[in-house]
């Protein structure tokens, strides 16, 4: 029944990131985020011994975790006492230090340019971080800023059958593609797809008997011009609005009825005051 159904529609916005290599930011790469507290305490307490004498430090580290109320899972406990796990993050830190030395500590308002420079430095120094390692480094030295440039995920050529299939899937025209996350690049038949800022992601409940795109144009785009619909994440739900279907409206009383009631209450309260003061 369309009266009770709705589309739960995901609304995305582009990532806008600034980036900068600083000693403070890259220092955090020494530690696994899920084990930051115990790893940081161990390094600040024992220094480089965590890389050479970790086995000897296990007892003290375990006692500190217990005193600090850290209830580590078996997996995390194993990683905390693993020299290879510590070395993994030390290597990550070393890569970041090399990149900082090459790129400097300038603030970049265009993350696309910053990422390009990082990739050039990686090739120049012939280091081979995995995609996940590079992402960890980039995430550590970047942050959202609404004044920064939008971060490009990829560009895509859309022509012929590929374009027609997409337009059919989205039920839109080529001119409406930006409302679904495909933005013209300025080059013929080329579209930009931006990275999404997940913490700005929102959702809208759209009645089943209404067009998702029409709703977006009316309720979302005027307030967030750079937002778009992620149609593939759309879900269908149902709810019953008891107020809408079962509430029985009671008409307001007339002014005359209310006025006469007020006068009666005033007379009653005046008589009560007279009784209290023994004036009657």
Model feature map: region roles:
Residues 273, 277-280:
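Coiled-coil heptad-register positions
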Residues 1-272:
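A conserved structural/catalytic subdomain of Rossmann-like adenosyl-cofactor enzymes
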